[in-house]
Regions:
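N-terminal Rossmann-like or analogous alpha/beta NTP/dinucleotide-binding catalytic cores
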Residues: 1-28, 36
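Short, flexible loop segments at boundaries between secondary-structure elements
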Residues: 27-52
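A polyampholytic, Gly/Pro-enriched intrinsically disordered region
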Residues: 46-66
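Acidic, metal-coordinating catalytic segment for phosphate/diphosphate chemistry
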Residues: 67-110
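Segments forming glycine/polar-rich beta-alpha architectures that bind adenosine-containing cofactors
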Residues: 121-124
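A conserved beta-turn-beta hairpin within the catalytic core of GNAT-like acetyltransferases
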Residues: 127-131
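Unchanged
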Residues: 139-243
């Protein structure tokens, strides 16, 4: 029986950017060009910016009724409150760099620490990613080398009771993750290191979340694979890249 209707995607794609429409290759894509009447970006910004509630109320009148109703219900949820707070933080963070002579590029480090089939994760204490699990890591100081920064941040955030020389000798691999849009904060290039700690017969080393982390814990790797929606930024994919090298 022939279909009584056809499904398609109508939208525009900005140069150099991935398109949402690309996620649905089974649907025919009709490029409409940029429409000045109603832009999804305008709706998103007004929806999450509490200071622009009036703008959202105006824009929402142009949405299909079921979509507007769904967004109104979602706006009363705890998840929306979290996202709105995160949005405000990101906007403030970007404004703080607005007067820089050039767009900033941030250099960070992350540590993938494996021990006896477990991975070491921390829970982020504050924005961005407040409450999400992440790899131990942070910004590189002006006067330190990349590897030293990774070891320092690892020990600061987890209180891992492993001497720095032992950690340095446990590095098995490293890689730079530099996708231009991997972080909402702005251009952030991270140097990630894989640490493989040898079993000692004393079980997993004790850890405790400190500094930017309110909790640190060892997570079984099989459990980690079910945590994609709980991980900060691209950390889930960073870990899985290294696991493919083990």
């Amino acid at each position: 029986k022939p279909a009584e209707f056809r499904i398609g995607m109508i939208g525009s794609q900005h140069a150099g950017e991935a398109s949402y429409c690309d996620f649905f290759p089974q649907w025919h894509h009709v490029s409409s060009g940029e429409q000045a009447v109603l832009l999804a970006a305008d709706i998103r910004h007004a929806y999450f910016d509490r200071e622009r509630a009036g703008d959202y109320d105006r824009l929402s009148q142009q949405l299909p009724q079921p979509v507007a109703q769904f967004l109104d219900v979602f706006r009363a949820s705890e998840t929306y409150a979290t996202l709105s707070s995160e949005y405000a933080y990101i906007q403030d963070y970007r404004r703080s760099w607005a007067r820089a002579p050039y767009p900033p590029t941030f250099v960070t480090v992350d540590s993938v620490v494996i021990h006896s089939g477990h991975i070491l994760l921390v829970r982020r204490r504050s924005h961005p990613g407040k409450g999400l699990w992440a790899l131990p890591g942070g910004f590189v100081d002006q006067d330190e080398r990349i590897r030293d920064a990774a070891i320092r941040e690892l020990r600061e955030e987890t209180r891992l009771k492993v001497p720095a020389p032992v950690l340095a000798g446990s590095i098995r691999s490293s890689r730079v993750f530099d996708h231009p849009h991997r972080s909402l904060r702005g251009r952030t290039i991270t140097h990630a290191f894989l640490f493989e700690l040898a079993p000692t017969g004393e079980g997993l080393p004790k850890v405790k979340g400190t500094d930017d982390a309110d909790k640190a814990k060892w997570v079984p790797l099989f459990e980690f694979q079910r945590m994609e929606d709980q991980l900060f930024e691209d950390h889930f994919y960073v870990v899985n890249w290294f696991l493919g090298q083990v």
